[in-house]
């Protein structure tokens, strides 16, 4: 600023000329530059140790003549969410914002959304310069997820109808997406197939019904899925559901067959649960009804119903005394249920196989549930 004195003269009210010397004044037109720096553009104050606070730096090129300063957090509507009055105006200062708004409950976090930082300094010459930061995102929530299964009923048996399942994944978040994973599980919630990636998923996944080891899904089984996405602040969301599998008629050598592990009997009994008001009964009814529909397309074939069991002890005694009679009786029960639904009993016979034809070793505790099944062999 440049000091200066002034003098003024002129007549007073009575017409007398008077002279007045003005006090010293300062003309201050120096520029007042302010700057804001941010250590990140996204803050996620949810206590997970990742991006929990925003470090804001202020730079004041001229501090002499500065009377006061204030930092403000501004939301997308222009409202001030948080004020940080600064007692002293320093050339460089650092403020941490952990997402808390002004108010009587500072433990709360401001709503997720887009904010800006505003820094203003008031000088004794009346100047009030203001610096505004680029936009920042406050994000404490995981992404909003959706799954749309396309091509149901899913029947990957190479008949040209619904052999591939389309899986449309949607991810909505105010932050960018860091990674995602879509897992398909078996009934014991062990990994069956997995898709994953970085960034947002593509518009649609295609699944051929096989596991990561090439194993085909089982008829009438419901495969759980788990969809997880993580945004770039570490917020994660997961949703779950099921992929229903249709009745599959697959070729095994020179034979066509249907293999089902999801026809459920009472424990150690050939009695089928057929109460429509129970989940097990409703599932059994749906499977049997669907079998009749499928076999109607193969009218030139006879059907052999085979019962299979798990030999837990691995002994001949269990095989002969328990499993052979039980698997035979269960096959007969299924045959009767098909006849009740309109199938010609003359084209259906039965065979109890016990534990003689396991899919996996009976000692495989994680997978031997697959051995307890009913197979339908299509014969000409």
Which role does the model predict for each range below?
Residues 10-12, 58-65, 101, 123, ...:
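Extracellular acidic, Ser/Thr/Pro-rich low-complexity tracts
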Residues 1, 80-109, 191-217:
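Glycine-centered tight-turn motifs at strand-turn-strand junctions
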Residues 42-53, 99-107, 113, 153-164, ...:
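Acidic, glycine-anchored loop motifs typical of Ca2+
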Residues 8-10, 119-121, 227-229, 378:
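Conserved structural position at the C-terminal beta-strand
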Residues 275, 308-380:
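Periplasmic OmpA-like peptidoglycan-binding domain that tethers envelope proteins to the cell wall
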Residues 3-5, 66, 112-116, 177, ...:
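Extracellular Ig-like/FN3 beta-sandwich strand-entry sites
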Residues 11-16, 104, 122-127, 212-214, ...:
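Short, solvent-exposed loop/turn segments at the edges of extracellular beta-sandwich modules
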Residues 28-44, 132-181, 193-201, 206, ...:
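Periplasmic peptidoglycan-binding/tethering modules of Gram-negative envelope proteins
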């Amino acid at each position: 600023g440049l000091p200066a004195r002034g003098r003024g003269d002129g007549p007073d009210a009575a017409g007398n000329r008077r002279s007045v010397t003005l006090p010293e004044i300062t003309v201050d037109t120096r520029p007042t530059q302010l700057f804001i720096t941010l250590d990140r553009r996204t803050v996620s104050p949810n206590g997970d140790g990742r991006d929990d606070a925003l470090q804001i730096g202020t730079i004041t090129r001229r501090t002499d003549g500065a009377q006061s300063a204030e930092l403000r957090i501004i939301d997308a509507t222009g409202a001030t969410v948080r004020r940080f009055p600064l007692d002293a105006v320093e050339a460089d200062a650092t403020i941490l914002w952990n997402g808390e708004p002004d108010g009587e409950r500072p433990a709360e976090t401001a709503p997720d959304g887009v904010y800006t930082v505003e820094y203003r300094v008031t000088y004794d010459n009346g100047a009030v310069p203001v610096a505004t930061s680029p936009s920042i995102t406050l994000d404490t929530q995981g992404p909003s997820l959706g799954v749309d299964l396309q091509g149901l009923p899913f029947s990957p048996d190479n008949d040209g109808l619904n052999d591939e399942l389309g899986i449309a994944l949607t991810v909505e978040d105010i932050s960018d997406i860091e990674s995602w994973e879509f897992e398909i599980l078996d009934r014991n919630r062990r990994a069956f197939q997995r898709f994953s990636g970085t960034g947002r998923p593509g518009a649609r996944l295609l699944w051929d019904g096989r596991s990561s080891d090439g194993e085909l899904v089982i008829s009438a089984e419901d495969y759980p899925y788990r969809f997880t996405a993580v945004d770039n602040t570490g917020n994660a969301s997961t949703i779950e559901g099921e992929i229903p599998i249709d009745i599959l008629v697959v070729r095994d050598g020179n034979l066509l067959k249907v293999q089902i592990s999801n026809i459920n009997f009472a424990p150690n009994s050939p009695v089928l649960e057929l109460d429509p008001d129970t989940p097990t009964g409703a599932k059994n009814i749906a499977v049997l009804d669907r079998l009749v529909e499928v076999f109607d397309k193969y009218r030139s074939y006879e059907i052999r119903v085979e019962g299979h069991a798990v030999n837990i002890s691995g002994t001949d005694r269990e095989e002969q005394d328990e499993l052979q009679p039980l698997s035979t009786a269960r096959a007969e029960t299924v045959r009767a249920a098909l006849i009740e639904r309109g199938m010609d009993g003359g084209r259906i016979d039965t065979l109890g196989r016990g534990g003689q034809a396991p899919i996996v070793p009976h000692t495989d505790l994680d997978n031997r549930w697959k051995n307890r099944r009913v197979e339908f062999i299509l014969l000409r």
